[in-house]
Amino acid sequence: MSQARTLHRLIAPAVEALGFELVGCELFRRGATTILQVFVDKPGGIGLDECAKVSRQISAVLDVEDPIRGRYTLEVSSPGLERPLYTANHYRRFIGNKAKIRLREPREGQRQFRGMIVAVDNEEQVTLQLDNKILKVPLGEIEKANLIADFEG
C-alpha cells in the first residue's frame, strides 16, 4: 500500500468526524520540502476557516501517529475546480464532465488523455469519450486524474 493510501486511512476518521469528505491526499517533494496535500469537501463547498479546523484535527492525529519521517508541510484545501479524481465514486459523480487522465503505462504510445467521462462500470473501469474514439481504462491503470474546468458553459 502506498504511503498516501496509508495516510488517507489514518486521517479519514478525523476528517469525517468533523462532517467533511476526505477527497484524497498526496505526499510529494517540492525541492527539499516534503508536502502532505489533503483535499477536503462538503456539499456546497468548504471555506478557509473549515480548512483550518480540519488542518488542526489532522495535525493532532499525525503528531500522535507520526507516520511521516522528518519534517513536512501540511496543506489542507478544497479540491478546487480541477479537482482530483481518486475513486470510482468520484468518476461516477462527475459523469458528463471533462477530465484529463495520465496512465501508469502508455497506450498506443500515449499516457495522457482528455475526454468526457461517460461511464464507470461495476468492475471500476472508467469510460471516456475522446474526440474521435472511446477509451476504457481500469481504475488501477490511472496514475493521476483531474476534472477540466469548463468556462465555456
Swiss-Prot record:
An example Pfam family from this entry, by short name, is DUF150_C
Q: Name one GO biological process term.
A: ribosomal small subunit assembly
GO CC annotation: cytosol
List locations, semicolon-separated.
Cytoplasm
Q: Which UniProt keywords apply?
A: Cytoplasm, Ribosome biogenesis
The record's section on InterPro entries has: Ribosome_maturation_RimP (IPR003728), RimP_C (IPR028998), RimP_C_sf (IPR036847), RimP_N (IPR028989), RimP_N_sf (IPR035956)
**Superkingdom of source:** Bacteria
What parts of the sequence cross the membrane? none
Write down the Gene3D superfamilies for this protein, in alphabetical order. Ribosome maturation factor RimP, C-terminal domain, RimP-like superfamily, N-terminal
Q: What does this protein do?
A: Required for maturation of 30S ribosomal subunits.
Which PANTHER family does UniProt cross-reference here?
RIBOSOME MATURATION FACTOR RIMP (PTHR33867:SF1)
State the family named in the UniProt similarity comment for this chain: Belongs to the RimP family.
What is the designated name of this protein? Ribosome maturation factor RimP
Q: Which organism is it from?
A: Coxiella burnetii (strain CbuK_Q154) (Coxiella burnetii (strain Q154))
